[in-house]
Structures are given as structure tokens and as C-alpha cells.
Amino acid sequence: MIVKTETIDSRLENWINEYQPDKIVVVSSETSFKLCLPHLSIHKKIDNIIYRLPDGESAKTIDYCQDFWSAMMRNEVTRKSVIIAIGGGAVLDFAGFCASVFMRGIACIYIPTTLLSMVDGSEGGKTGINFYGTKNIIGTFTKPNAILRNVDFLSSLPQTEVLSGWAEIIKHGILQGSVIWDMVKNGIPSFDDEEYWMELVRQNIQFKKIR
């Protein structure tokens, strides 16, 4: 689902009201903790457990997994709890994996904050961490309970992150050869054009689902 900030809040609230988790565990990268999490109402719930990870692939280690699982046990997280992952692909990989094996699986919601994770990393149900220098060698195929993509977050990205995601969109456009490619030819749109970004992300998600 591609939404705006206020819609993410209402969707999260609806999901929480329906699922009634006993605890909410927020996993966030350092950058998303500073730039994205404060814009979500979930940040204001004082009973939330917030676990912060370093940015990028350095977070995807067994050491961080063990530390995170220990933190959840100390806070008496149960199978009725939910993990909400806020960040790029590395955070989603980490949180999805940890959720899939803790107590044989607890609920997990993805809120991707980078362009690459919105159009690619959050789809497919792949989770994983790196081990002994091999990327994603330990992992599971576990789909999250929900994915909420917020295009408002794109304006917080550095140029390198935008270009990384745009490269993936170009690849999708070449492979699809129709709508996405036509949009790619128009160049990177202004972040003020939220409707265009929402449609662009939507087209990429649909392409990923049929591959």
C-alpha cells in the first residue's frame, strides 16, 4: 500500500485496533529514527519498545539479532506482540528475520523509508542477515503482515539513496518496457509531486508481483 503520512497513522491504528497486540516493538535505523519516526503517531505511544540499528548492511549480523531478541525477552514480548520496522532494506531484512523466528514467528509490519526498499526490498517475503562475509546466507521466506509505503519520506533521502532506488526503477522499466519505462523517460520527478511518486511506486510493486 502506498500512502501519505496521515494515512499511515490511520492504517496503523486500524491494524492495531483489530489485532490488539499486547506490545509494540519499533525497529528503526538511526537515520529513520531521526527523520521519519517523529512524523508518525506511533512515536508518541510511551509504552512502545524502540530498538535502534545502525544504517545499512552493518545491522544485519547475528550479534544484533541476539541483542534484539534479548531486549524483547527482557521486555516480555509475546507471540501476541507486533514488530514495526521503519527504515531501508537492511532494517526490513533484519526485523523480518528476527520476527519470523522469535517464538516461531510473531507479527511484523514494514514501513520502508528509502526508494529502493519501497520499489524492491519490501516485496517478495525474503528476510535475512549476513554471516561470515556472505550476504543474506541466513534467512527465511516470510511475508510481513502489512507494508505501508510513505512517499513523504523520500524528500529526506540523500541524493545517493535516491539514485540507488532510481537505478532499480530503470531496470524495472527496461524489463517491463511499457508504463514504467515511459515514466522513467520523464526523469526523476519533484518530491512535491506526491501523486506521481505514488503511481510510480505502485507500478513498480505491480511489476515485482508478476515477475
Residue ranges and their predicted role:
Residues 1-82:
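ATP/NTP phosphate-donor binding region
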Residues 97-192:
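A glycine/threonine-rich phosphate-anchoring loop and its flanking beta-alpha core
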Residues 90-97:
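Short glycine/serine/threonine-rich phosphate/pyrophosphate-binding segments
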Residues 11, 130, 209:
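Catalytic phosphate-donor-binding core of small-molecule kinases
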Residues 187-211:
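Oxyanion-binding "anion nests"
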Residues 24-25, 83, 108, 146:
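A residue-level structural signature of the nucleotidyltransferase/glycosyltransferase Rossmann-like core
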Residues 81-90:
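A glycine-rich beta-strand to alpha-helix segment
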